[in-house]
Amino acid sequence: MVNKENARSVGQQVKWIGSQDELPPVKNLEHKNVYFYQKCIYGPLTLSVGDFILVSNADAAEPDTVSGCDVARILHMYELRELTDREPCRAIVQWYSWPKAIPHNKYDDDEVAIDFSLEVIEEHRPYDNDVALGAIYRKCIVLEGTSKTSAEEILKRHANKLKSTACPMFVSRYRFVKVKRSYRLIPLEIHLEQPEDNARPTRSSRKSLTAHRESKRSISARHDDTAGNKGSSVEKRRRASMAASSSVEFIDVNSFICENKVSPIKIVGGRSVVRLSEKKNAPEINANYLPASPLTEKNAKVETPKSRASAARRNLNLSLDRGADTTADSDCLNYSIVQQTPDPKTPSNDMKIKLRLSERRRSVRLASMDVDPLSLEEAVQEPNAQGRKRLGVANGDIYHTPTKKSKEPLESAAATEQTPSTRRKSILKSATSRLAEGTPRRSIHLSNIVEQRVFEDDEIISTPKRGRSKKTVQDNDEDYSPKKSVQKTPTRTRRSSTTTKTATTPSKGITTATATPMTPSQKMKKIRAGELSPSMQQRTDLPAKDSSKSELQLAREQLHVSVVPKSLPCREREFENIYAFLEGKIQDQCGGCMYVSGVPGTGKTATVTGVIRTLQRMAKQNELPAFEYLEINGMRLTEPRQAYVQIYKQLTGKTVSWEQAHALLEKRFTTPAPRRVTTVLLVDELDILCNRRQDVVYNLLDWPTKSAAKLVVVTIANTMDLPERLLMGKVTSRLGLTRLTFQPYSHKQLQEIVTARLGGSETFKGEAVQLVARKVAAVSGDARRALDICRRATEIADTAAVKCVTMLHVQQALAEMIASAKVQAIRNCSRMEQIFLQAIAAEVTRTGVEETTFMGVYQQVETIAAFMGVTFPPPGRALRLCSKLGAERLIISEHSRNDLFQKILLNVSADDIHYALRVEEMVN
């Protein structure tokens, strides 16, 4: 924070030029003693209202460079005549953001083309626009242009005028403004009413946006003389906000009736969006309104007939070519909506769909229909002779195509007359089977308005349906009637798993065999193309299980502690408390600390990270201000001061020494920055960071108390009384009183957690899960330990070739988990190795010294072997046993070159040896 001495020094460096201005309506300054000016001199800079400047970003790695600054335009300059800690000479600015600071999903629109090296974007997010003049690095130049002109062209256009300047130059063509409930990139030539207001536009404003699109032109076009003469008598109207994706817009149906030109159709992201034409005269209020897609009104433009027709062909062909196959057999699909109106003075409601398919694709798609439902107009050009020859049809009857052949005998013997029974009010073609060569399929989709408007009730088209099974054909054999004979030409035959067509609907009659399962990417492509429609059952079902894995293997994978569960059972109250704390701090953009404690395995880290994921998802949906998330774990640090290095690396991506990282973090969290977002820091295993000086923990808990930091720290430790037992008083006071304790899980909660992980699998019996839950809850309540025991039980059951885990398997796993690893290693040793360990323990007990020699141990080996009736080993074999136990780290021994005088030391306790080598187990 700037102290008073620095504030006075900065104020003395600023020299105001001109007289004081009237008080403009600036928020937060209405009740303060301030004087506004138009111009000033600050050091070597001469600043005026309207100048573009570079403001140093305190959060950047190099704030004294162009890349470490933010671009802004000065709106007001004022001097604060009150004694505060802030700098008195300040400015109100309009921010401009670098393209990398805008979410990447905002660039998905095909009409947005950003040059990341030259452009800046006018920012309308609620950043603090009050900056000190001392933070200004230098002046710059921002050239505003239209979205139809590239950034390089704008720079070249002003190159001659700006040759002498050495200021950095940028181009601005878009603004990032809030429309309805989300932020969007809007070209500068589009002026919106109250861009940051969430209120819905009125119907008149929507009509103004629809009816007066022609006034949405470039900035250069506004200064054109001809455009100025034409528009001198027309009053400028402010544009309404663009329609959001969640809202419902209304358009007049009469615009479809009176429009007699081709409207371009653009396919965006697999969805077909009809670009509607507007009426040239202002629309009247009509009760006959239909809801339309927001994208429809967004893409609406007023164009000349020639440019509109060319745009239709260009947009449609580009959209189709992007998703088409690169092979020679790819579809050639083109369609548009035209009116069958020979005289433009006599409008008609009859509309037709003009469709052009490749001959090869047409012969496959329309083979099962006697008359194609999408008949061409008489003026459509007929296919060439070669295409007619390939189709086997006569001139003027290009859609009477022969039916397909099938290798099933029933299809060649009987065919049904086409009697469509079910009709739909759409021109949506059903997905057909793929060609053998792999020709991609594509369906035709139009909006509901066009579907209901294009065809009258007596012109509704039936959709071809697939053939039914053999059983249906045999049961309904008496309903068949002979079909009209049609001249057939040789077509490509395919193997079929079904039989002839039914009498009710026109069908393909040919269904391919079961294909290989589709990958998720292929499935999503088909859903976007409209060939598949996602159902609720498909979204809720679990992913397909791998047939090569058994049920026990799948259960073992789900029981692993590293698997992230879909939900956190039994921690709903703790989740809500952490969520409320973090959400409030992010909303208020202030700092704070929270201490989370609990025994290991109680879900502390999982609950906090689950809250963070929820908050990040809300921030992406613009329901919460953006924030940064950092995470450090004391177990992953070589020493406590490395926490500074990890935090700075996550903030900037650079690795520096801990001294430099500490200095830079101290500067960052104590220096105010107007565009700084809230930072959430998760410190796991806080007790490991507690060194003797406790400086690391003190700094991590002291930074959130700074008003300029906007830092929220969530600390996690296993000890409930860590602040009072280990931390000093000044550290404990900064930790605050916001504490949350995770209690150990009860047996019912552990049983619920294990059952949720199994996900309805029948690999565990209920009493087996209950036994694990009760055993673990009685000892520690550690959910990780319960999952490990269940996982080990599945391994034991899998080894025994059993498909279900019983209580015997759980008891065996419990016995292994309760015993230590050293005890397990001793039990798995050979008989002579166990005798050697027993001899070492006996020699240590006899001498009272933990360190002994091989000679004394060998004497004990001879005695124990004679007592147990075992042939005692020779000294050479005993030396080999000593070396093997030393390699297993059960004992610590010198090099074997010392022979009988090498020193031996037990690496396990004598109690572990006696526990592992009980007399009854040795006898057995």
UniProtKB/Swiss-Prot annotation:
Q: Give residues annotated as binding ATP.
A: 564, 598-606, 685, 718, 784
Q: Where is this region: Disordered?
A: 196-239, 377-440, 460-523
- Basic and acidic residues: bias regions: 211-227
Top-level taxon of origin: Eukaryota
- Chief location bin: nucleus
Kindly indicate whether the keyword Phosphoprotein belongs to this entry: yes
GO MF annotations in UniProt: ATP binding; ATP hydrolysis activity; chromatin binding; DNA replication origin binding; metal ion binding
Query: Any idea which UniProt keywords this protein has?
Result: ATP-binding, DNA replication, DNA-binding, Magnesium, Metal-binding, Nucleotide-binding, Nucleus, Phosphoprotein
User: What is the annotated role of this protein in its UniProt record?
Assistant: Component of the origin recognition complex (ORC) that binds origins of replication. DNA-binding is ATP-dependent, however specific DNA sequences that define origins of replication have not been identified so far. ORC is required to assemble the pre-replication complex necessary to initiate DNA replication.
Q: Which family does it belong to?
A: Belongs to the ORC1 family.
| Name of the featured protein | Origin recognition complex subunit 1
Q: Please spell out the taxonomic lineage of the organism that makes this protein.
A: Eukaryota, Metazoa, Ecdysozoa, Arthropoda, Hexapoda
User: Which gene specifies this protein's sequence?
Assistant: Orc1
